[in-house]
């Protein structure tokens, strides 16, 4: 952890009011420990069972498909310190006329999710503006294509290349190089993240859980909302990472945890952050 923390570099972009560049941290090229082993997965299943009162995630084998623990390599890149916020996304919507985050009832109900449609209304935009009081919350109800469109706009505006991270880039930034179970260490601590264990059962302003930062300085890499990656997982699906405010346990909030969602899904539990090349 000390070695990773020493490498932390924060780049807030050009210091001018009109610059839309999100703050980033620099991640050096090189190896890191990715994936999980049996001991980590067993720990995840045990903390889930304690939270849910049953071994449901073990029975459904939630974590059995994780990458086998081992060394992986990435190049150097920078990644946004926080998830992209409603305020940041609003500049894109205003400038381009891109559809604002929302989902209609029929589409939502076609997803077959457990959350009722009424719950989506607190996150839906009106008149091209984010919900009042949620400007600093992560933007949600965005598909992977929406995230890519925001990245393309930011690229044009800043003359720097912005994109979604791939799964390994995201995982390295979220856990550091030493293979820890969570961004902060190997023990789950419900006070270090926004999850259903101790959170408000809702999104919060980004960066609130500072004690849950990763060794590289990422905030909300565990909990808050899942995050789109560019890594495909079969036809029309992409890997999402990070866990959410709706999860408890929170084995799914580990950086090694992974599952995929349809790329067109607009979910109240999925947002994104970006890599800058």
Language-model segments: which ranges?
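Bacterial N-terminal signal peptides
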Residues: 1-10
């Amino acid at each position: 952890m000390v070695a990773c923390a020493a490498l932390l570099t924060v780049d807030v972009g050009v210091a001018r009011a009109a610059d839309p560049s999100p703050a980033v941290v620099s991640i050096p090229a090189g190896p890191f420990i990715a994936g999980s082993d049996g001991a980590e997965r067993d720990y995840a299943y045990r903390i889930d069972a304690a939270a849910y009162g049953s071994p449901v995630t073990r029975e459904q084998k939630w974590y059995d498909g994780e990458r086998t623990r081992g060394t992986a390599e990435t190049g150097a890149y920078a990644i946004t310190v926080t998830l992209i916020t409603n305020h940041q996304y609003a500049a894109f919507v205003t400038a381009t006329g891109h559809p604002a985050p929302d989902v209609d009832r029929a589409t939502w109900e076609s997803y077959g999710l457990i959350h009722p449609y009424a719950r989506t209304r607190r996150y839906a935009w009106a008149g091209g503006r984010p919900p009042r009081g949620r400007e600093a919350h992560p933007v949600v109800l965005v598909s992977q294509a929406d995230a890519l469109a925001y990245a393309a706009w930011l690229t044009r505006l800043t003359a720097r290349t912005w994109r979604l991270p791939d799964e390994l880039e995201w995982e390295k930034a979220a856990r550091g190089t030493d293979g820890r179970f969570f961004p902060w260490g190997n023990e789950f601590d419900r006070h270090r993240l926004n999850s259903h264990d101790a959170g408000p059962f809702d999104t919060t302003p980004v960066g609130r859980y500072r004690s849950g930062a990763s060794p590289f300085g990422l905030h909300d890499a565990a909990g808050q909302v899942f995050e789109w990656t560019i890594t495909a997982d079969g036809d029309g699906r992409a890997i999402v990472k990070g866990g959410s405010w709706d999860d408890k346990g929170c084995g799914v909030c580990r950086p090694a945890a992974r599952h995929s969602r349809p790329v067109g899904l607009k979910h109240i539990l999925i947002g994104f952050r970006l890599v800058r090349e």
